Amino acid sequence: LSVSLSMNPLYQKCLAIVIIGLILTQCGKKKSSQAYVQEGIKYSNQGNYDKAKESFLKAVEEDPKNLAGHYGLGGIYNLEKQYIAAEKSFKSTIQLDPTHYNAWYSLGYTYELMGKTKDAEISYTKYRRLKEKMDSIMNKEKH
């Protein structure tokens, strides 16, 4: 008598273990990039900047195009007086979204902290232009 494979109790146990394993790996999925950003913001608001930095780093690792992750990192780097790293983070934000006026302002502030007044003024000028355009658009939508 031949016993079919699907009726074999050992086969059924192995299959059950594989299915449970697949289900459990789905339950243990990594957080999304946005979830890491939200976590980073929460930690920043609590003054826990080391944890915030860790969360923002995970956000950009998970999604290198995450604007908020790069922007949050820039702020943390400024607090840590790591101005070159802050400059890089804000430039990454701007590269992904050239209209991100807060990133232009923050880049200007970083340049100011670095003593690069000409670069700071260029960034502040771009910030003001973008902010004025955004405010103009928002005012038109209100009326």
Where are these regions (language model features)?
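Structural marker of alpha-solenoid helical repeat scaffolds
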Residues: G28, E62, L96, R129-L130
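Canonical positions in the second alpha-helix
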Residues: K58-A59, S92-T93, K126-Y127
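Terminal, low-structured helical/coil segments at or just beyond the last alpha-helical repeat
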Residues: E112-H143
